[in-house]
């Protein structure tokens, strides 16, 4: 399977596989850039086209093994700027969208297929069926991989490592599952440390400590390093700089802890595959969208090896593991929270005022979602704040205050997301509470951009 990517096939530095792959009579599926690669390699032509991002209707034009059973039309997720102008000889068009006349092509005889859309994202209807058709029907593979099998394999691999493991836990499902897998494998050789970086949700440091002590029998301790992180972030506005500073400070905290409580040979992290893809360090030429504090390797001066048992999984798969490991539903259904914390939900410099606004406003958003029954139905929700201000009227007096942006999205794996259509009365209650309970806020807005083109977090 040739995946999508940011390159154009007519660029001199465009990534291509070894040419012999095209002459080995192997089933091939090209997705987005991979689709254009197949068109080019088999003698067709690719051209620069109008950019097409987001949802489109794919109309099925001809029968094929690839699109078998998907219906006459489906909603497909697009993210491209090139398209096939001429398809290769021996291929047929099996599907089109309004913006791409050859959105799906096939050579059933060669078992070679190209699709301009992304079947791997949840917003593409029947996307899983399309991938199943290729893997099972075209390639003849068997479905014998299970989450239970993954757990057994991971525990077996971890049990063979030597030395003690230091695991950074945040209270989120990713690092919690990592801690439980390692504990299952090596027991007392694991030490979990929670770092209060001053960028957490309201009362989170207390809630995380209680959660671990009440639910899990692992070695757990916490470190208060809030002042250290906030001091380093003073005057910093660039989002990438903030992310890198947070990542570096985590390493400094872990290093100091390891020197005092060690020896440790390993540092375990809850890195997932979307983190790796967005950081541009996956096995391929993915574009760097934003760095992640736990991705990219460790600095040379840190004498610890990295352990990332979940680095090839997505969030929905991690939640399945959590269920199998007996994690209470309340814990594994918590909304994802970024590693750099509120620093990436605060646009511009992290200041005490903006930090407090983000904490309190986000808590109000979560409370109202729980009250209305929407919390477990959405993927993620929070309130962001920047430097923009607007005039308001409070108690018949003019007030110049901050603008808060509410963000609520639906997703499965965080690779794509759609903004949630909340009832107006829920949004109204959020807005009223935020402006009434936070003196510095005068306006509340609701963000209605999907991913792509936006990202889930603002920075």
Task: Identify the meaning behind each predicted range.
Residues 3-5, 169, 271:
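Glycine-rich, N-terminal phosphate-binding loop of Rossmann-like dinucleotide-binding domains
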Residues 29-35:
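Helix-terminus/capping and membrane-interface signal
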Residues 7-8, 274:
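Active-site beta-alpha loop architecture of Rossmann-like, nucleotide-cofactor-dependent enzymes
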Residues 264-274:
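Glycine-rich phosphate-binding loop
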Residues 1-3, 62, 268:
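Structural motif
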């Amino acid at each position: 399977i040739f995946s999508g990517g940011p390159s154009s096939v007519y660029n001199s530095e465009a990534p291509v596989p070894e040419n012999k792959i095209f002459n080995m009579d192997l089933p091939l599926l090209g997705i987005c850039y991979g689709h254009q690669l197949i068109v080019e390699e088999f003698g067709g032509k690719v051209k620069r086209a109008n950019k097409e991002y987001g949802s489109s209707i794919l109309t099925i034009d001809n029968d094929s093994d690839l699109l078998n059973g998907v219906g006459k039309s489906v909603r497909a997720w697009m993210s491209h700027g090139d398209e096939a102008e001429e398809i290769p000889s021996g291929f047929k068009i099996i599907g089109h969208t309004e913006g791409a006349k050859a959105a799906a092509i096939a050579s059933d005889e060669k078992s070679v297929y190209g699709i301009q859309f992304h079947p791997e994202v949840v917003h593409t209807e029947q996307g899983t069926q399309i991938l199943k058709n290729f893997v099972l029907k075209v390639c003849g593979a068997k479905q014998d991989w299970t989450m239970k099998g993954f757990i057994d394999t991971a525990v077996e691999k971890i049990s063979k490592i030597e030395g003690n493991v230091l695991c950074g836990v945040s209270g989120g499902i990713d690092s919690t599952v990592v801690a439980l897998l390692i504990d299952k494998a090596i027991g007392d050789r694991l030490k979990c440390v929670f770092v209060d970086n001053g960028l957490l949700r309201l009362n989170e440091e207390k809630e995380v400590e209680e959660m671990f002590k009440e639910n899990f029998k692992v070695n757990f301790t916490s470190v208060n390093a809030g002042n250290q992180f906030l001091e380093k972030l003073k005057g910093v506005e660039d989002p990438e700089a903030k992310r890198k500073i947070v990542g570096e400070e985590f390493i400094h905290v872990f290093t100091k802890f390891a020197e005092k409580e060690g020896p440790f040979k390993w540092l375990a992290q809850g890195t997932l595959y979307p983190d790796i893809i967005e950081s541009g360090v996956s096995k391929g030429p993915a574009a760097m969208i934003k760095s992640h504090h736990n991705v990219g390797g460790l600095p040379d001066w840190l004498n610890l090896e990295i352990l990332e048992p979940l680095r090839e999984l997505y969030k929905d798969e991690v939640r399945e593991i959590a269920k199998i490991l007996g994690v209470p539903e309340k814990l594994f259904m918590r909304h994802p929270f970024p590693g750099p914390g509120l620093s990436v939900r605060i646009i511009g410099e992290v200041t005490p005022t903006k930090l407090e606004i983000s904490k309190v406003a986000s808590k109000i958003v979560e409370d109202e979602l729980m009250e209305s029954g929407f919390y477990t139905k959405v993927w993620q929700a929070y309130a962001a704040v920047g430097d923009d201000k607007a005039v308001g009227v409070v108690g018949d007096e003019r007030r110049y205050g901050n603008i808060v942006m509410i963000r609520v999205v639906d997703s499965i794996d965080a690779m794509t997301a759609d903004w949630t259509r909340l009832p107006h009365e829920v949004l109204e209650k959020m807005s009223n509470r935020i402006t009434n309970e936070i003196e510095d806020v005068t306006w509340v807005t609701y963000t209605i951009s999907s991913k792509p083109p936006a990202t889930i977090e603002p920075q």
